[in-house]
Amino acid sequence: MIILIIHIVISFILDGLLSNYISTNIINPSYFRTIYSVVSLVVIFSYFDEHKKYIYILLILGSLFDIVYTNTFLLNIVIFFIIYLIINILNNYIPNNILTINLKSILAILAYHILSFLILSLVNYHTYNISTLGIILYRSIIMTIIYTSISYSILKKAYYKIYDKKVK
C-alpha cells in the first residue's frame, strides 16, 4: 500500500508544481495539464479489495486539494466521491488494461471538469463559459493519457513485483 500512497503524494505534488511551471490560464489552457490527483485515484482503484481504505484516501486527498489548490470547502471531496462512484461502476463492467484505464481516466477528468463547472455555475461563480470548458476538456486529454499510461505501467510492474497481491 505504501507504493500507492507514494504515487498519490507524487501526483498531488505534480498538480502544484506543474501549474507553476507550465504557462497556462483559463482562457488558453495548456495541452500538458491534467489533474494528476484524479488520474492517480483512477489508477490505484483496482489495487484495493476493500473500498473503505480507498474512500479514506479519497477523502483525505479531496480535503487537501480543497485546502491547498482550490481554496474551496467540500467541493473537491464531493467531486472526488462522485468520480469514485463512476469508477466503481465502470470497474464492474470494464476490465483493467492500458486501454481501459486510459478511458476511465479520461472519463474521470471529464467528470471533474464538468462537475466543477456545473457546481460553480449553480452558485453563480462564473469564471469561464461553456466554450472555454470545451477547450479545457479537449486539451487535458493528451496529458491524461500520457500520465495514466506511465502510472499504470509503473504501478503494475512495481506493485506485483513487490507484493503480488491486492491491498486488503
Residue ranges and their predicted role:
Residues 1-168:
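Terminal, non-globular segments
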